[in-house]
Amino acid sequence: VIDVINLKKSFGSHDVLNGIDITINKGDIVVVIGPSGSGKSTFLRCLNCMEDPTGGQIIFNDVDIADPHVDINVHRRHMGMVFQHFNLFNNKTVLENIMLAPVHVRCKGLHGAKRKEEVKKIREQAMALLARINMQDKADVYPSTLSGGQKQRVAIVRSLAMNPDVILFDEPTSALDPEMVGEVLDLMKSLADEGMTMVIVTHEMGFAKEVANRVIFIDDGKILEEATPEEFFNHPKNPRLKDFLSKVLV
């Protein structure tokens, strides 16, 4: 699905990513871990060009989306993104949040009865997504009335509404109260079971062990280790990874 070749990113004279190479295949669950400031969130934001790479290639569905001549919005439709702070529109209801992108894309150029019919279909699909997370009774409320866990689950199904080829998660549980983390991770596990391709920046080591098929360790803008969860956590090779795990696995 995604082939990253020699990806580089600088902010001014500060090099944040120093030549990242990774292939993400269909159905992969890739968990990205690393210390604060290591470049892991920048790496994720470069994957859908929310941050413009300074160098390298990002081949997504056979197109180099890092090429400035490519219309990135066409490709972003196929790449969901879930943020740490939910990024729901507070002036729109839960249902409107989920319908917004599909209506914008699928109803473009439609008028009258055809548009009405398409909006009806999108509404039904959005309600089915809410039913999946047992939140159909929240369709007409505004995000400010929801708990953090509910907001994040809405944000995840909002990304599903576009039928993406891959979903990127940027620390999806780090802004949540501890008792709400489980409901979000359970939803992510169910997506993994269905074969959704996911790239996840997270501090949830238990989730990485249980759900990932690959874990990568980024530090100082480079991938220092990439392995199966079993190898990664039980037999780490890189000294910096060993040191990192000794601090986070208590």
Named regions from a protein language model:
Residues 1-229:
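ABC family nucleotide-binding domain
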Residues 219, 224-226, 230-250:
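C-terminal boundary and immediately downstream tail of ABC-type ATPase nucleotide-binding domains
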